[in-house]
A protein has these predicted regions:
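Conserved Rossmann-fold NAD(P)-dependent oxidoreductase catalytic core, especially the SDR/UDP-sugar
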Residues: 34, 42, 80, 84, ...
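Short, polar loop motifs at secondary-structure junctions
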Residues: 37-44, 148-151
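NAD(P)H-binding glycine-rich loop region in Rossmannoid oxidoreductase-like domains
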Residues: 43-102, 186-189
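N-terminal Rossmann NAD(P)H-binding glycine-rich loop of SDR-like oxidoreductase domains
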Residues: 2-31
Length: 205
């Protein structure tokens, strides 16, 4: 039964097979949110109660628009993307959200490795990130960059089930990060900023 005191949100996760994506799904379902895994192969993920699967990728504006329509917030797990591909992927995400109009655009959480964007000493990195920063600043969207710590690869939703004392340390690390992201979604303390997740206990900066 749904806890009526908890707002039920419709959340989407791009790259849901990423370890953090799996942790987000587990944490969001535990909080009784409705979760959509956004991926280009609907057979690539195990069905479970409360989890929906929708076709979606960050390859084009139109596929993004169709995937995120009707969602309250979208988490794009970009840790596995090549740095040079990030501006294009993020551009499709931003433009897809803008195409839904002000009333329909979800909040965006761009989760990845952003040192090169926020603390760059390299002129090439600085030039690469300039367009992305302009796009984010000019979009008017509700967005948050999230700097994620290194996480173990290959974690799955079932790794996060059970009591806190029975979850492995690597799974606990990923789950703590996911819980911190869901707290940020609720509190909105880092809108239009870069949120740095620390590894231990999902700490935030």
């Amino acid at each position: 039964m749904h806890n009526l005191e908890t707002p039920r949100l419709k959340l989407g996760v791009f790259n849901p097979l990423d370890s953090l994506g799996q942790a987000l799904i587990a944490a969001a379902l535990h909080r009784q949110h409705e979760v959509s895994a956004l991926l280009d192969d609907l057979n690539g993920i195990t069905a479970r109660p409360g989890l929906r699967c929708k076709l979606g990728s960050l390859e084009s504006v139109e596929t993004v628009k169709q995937a995120i329509a009707g969602l309250d917030a979208v988490f794009a797990c970009l840790g596995g993307e090549r740095q040079e591909d990030l501006p294009a992927r993020c551009g499709c995400l931003i433009d897809g959200a803008l195409a839904l109009g002000d009333a329909g655009a979800p909040g965006l959480f761009l989760v990845g490795r952003w040192e090169w964007l926020v603390d760059s000493d390299d002129s090439g990195d600085e030039a690469l990130g300039a367009g992305l920063r302009r796009s984010l600043d000019a979009s008017g969207l509700d967005w948050t960059l999230v700097e994620m710590p290194p996480l173990a690869a290959g974690l799955r939703v079932d790794d996060f089930s059970g009591e806190a004392t029975t979850i492995g340390s690597e799974a606990r690390r990923a789950l703590d990060c996911a819980e911190a992201l869901l707290d940020e979604l609720r509190l909105g303390l880092h809108r239009h900023q870069c949120l740095r997740l620390r590894g231990a206990n999902g700490g935030r900066d």
